[in-house]
Amino acid sequence: MSDNIISFDHVTFTYPDSPRPAVSDLSFAIERGSWTALIGHNGSGKSTVSKLINGLLAPDDLDKSSITVDGVKLGADTVWEVREKVGIVFQNPDNQFVGATVSDDVAFGLENRAVPRPEMLKIVAQAVADVGMADYADSEPSNLSGGQKQRVAIAGILAVKPQVIILDESTSMLDPEGKEQILDLVRKIKEDNNLTVISITHDLEEAAGADQVLVLDDGQLLDQGKPEEIFPKVEMLKRIGLDIPFVYRLKQLLKERGIVLPDEIDDDEKLVQSLWQLNSKM
């Protein structure tokens, strides 16, 4: 039996003055320790889901729906308990900075939890080191690059030891190299701390590395499954305005020409190896 750390059960949420729900009758589960990519076009409800998970928003009717995080059912009396379990890294890290230095910013969440200063200093130093920013501990966040700022934002979340990290379009403003560095960092942190990661993105290249993909369209769950189950559905993804990852685009073109590659070919390295093997047999 799987151990689900997050579950949505018939969740509907409508923003004030909106004529229609942002998410409608949404039900899904996320397994503990997994990496889940939540994909969809702009306005599909992705970021609304992240705010619902963290209790920043509440379902329209808690009597008809429920959100459970790490065994705690979200409600008015449990919202702070849930927020301690979930950390969000947003698209623009500048909106998250509150400290004059990197160390001050990472310490902010610990100060709110009244962590004793000697213990806090140790935690901050470790978190800053874990994200590769020890040399910038006394620097002003405003002087850092975009990738460095995201590292600091991740350190601030890591310091308070959540069970879940949500990346809410947090790599969308980075160049390809910076994006891959941040994703590699989060993968390492996930494994080292047995965290659950939710990546909210419209970048399917990023989503290709997830354990599970949830596809949202107009606030509803359109499909879900492993990347190798979702990405071959080229017409569905095109219909909702998403760009297919290169590997899957090429596999589709080859298939149309009678060359069918195995389902497990899901990244560039495997693709190149498979094509070399195919060429050697010709």
Curated annotation (Swiss-Prot):
Keywords from the UniProt entry: ATP-binding, Cell membrane, Membrane, Nucleotide-binding, Translocase, Transport
Q: Is 4Fe-4S found in the keyword set? A: no
Occurrences of domain ABC transporter (ranges): 6-243
Q: How does it sit in the membrane?
A: Peripheral membrane protein
* Cellular localisation: Cell membrane
> From which domain of life does this come?
Bacteria
Note the CDD domains from the entry.
Answer: ABC_cobalt_CbiO_domain1
Q: Which Pfam families match?
A: ABC_tran (PF00005)
Disulfide bond entries: none
The record's SMART domains line, in alphabetical order, gives:
AAA (SM00382)
- What GO molecular function terms would the record report? ATP binding; ATP hydrolysis activity; ATPase-coupled transmembrane transporter activity
CC terms in the record's Gene Ontology section = ATP-binding cassette (ABC) transporter complex
Q: Which residues bind ATP?
A: 40-47
**EC annotation from Swiss-Prot or TrEMBL:** 7.-.-.-
| Subunit (UniProt) | Forms a stable energy-coupling factor (ECF) transporter complex composed of 2 membrane-embedded substrate-binding proteins (S component), 2 ATP-binding proteins (A component) and 2 transmembrane proteins (T component).
The function of this protein is: ATP-binding (A) component of a common energy-coupling factor (ECF) ABC-transporter complex. Unlike classic ABC transporters this ECF transporter provides the energy necessary to transport a number of different substrates.
Q: Which family does it belong to?
A: Belongs to the ABC transporter superfamily. Energy-coupling factor EcfA family.
Quote the protein name from its UniProt record.
Answer: Energy-coupling factor transporter ATP-binding protein EcfA1
> What's the name of its gene?
ecfA1
